[in-house]
Structures are given as C-alpha cells and as structure tokens.
Design a protein with these regions (language model features):
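Long, contiguous binding/interaction regions
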Residues: 1-89
Length: 89
C-alpha cells in the first residue's frame, strides 16, 4: 500500500476536547513520525503539529475525526513523497 508524508496542523480552542484528541492521536500512533505542541496561553489556545507517514485514507480519516471535535480545527498538508508501506527512502 502506498503511503504519504503529511502534516496535520491542529488548533485547540476548547481544552475539554484534549482527552479525545489525545485518544485519537494514540489510535493512529503507529503512523505518527512526531508531534509538537505549543500552548499559547495569552490567547487561550494550543497549537499542535503532527507529522505522519501513512496511507492517504488514514491521514484523511484522522484529520476528519480531529476536525469534528468541539473547539478543534485541523488542516492537512501532503508532501509529494509517495512510497510503498515498509519501504525505506
């Protein structure tokens, strides 16, 4: 199966959604290369970047589930790098 490298940018405006967001990220953890979170306390938001190497349908599913959480928005950016699952580039 082909995989793509992608970045999901997440903004959390409702802290009560944090547990559900972390559960989703844990569910897709085998595809996650890394993540970085920045609390912006002055504005009361948290900004999270998640980098994945996964089949495109898995990336889209995760992004969609994240975007449906209350007070959470997500945007996905895909690289042009496509490889077969298990292949090292």
């Amino acid at each position: 199966m082909e995989t793509r490298v992608a970045l999901i940018g997440i903004i959390v405006e409702q802290e009560s959604s944090a547990a559900a967001l972390n559960a989703l990220l844990h569910e897709y953890g085998s595809y996650i290369i890394g993540r970085m979170g920045l609390p912006y306390r002055e504005r009361g938001v948290n900004i999270i970047s998640v980098v994945l190497d996964a089949p495109q349908d898995k990336i889209a599913a995760l992004s969609g589930k994240i975007g449906r959480l209350p007070g959470v928005s997500a945007k996905t950016q895909y690289s042009n790098v496509i490889s077969r699952e298990g292949e090292n580039q």
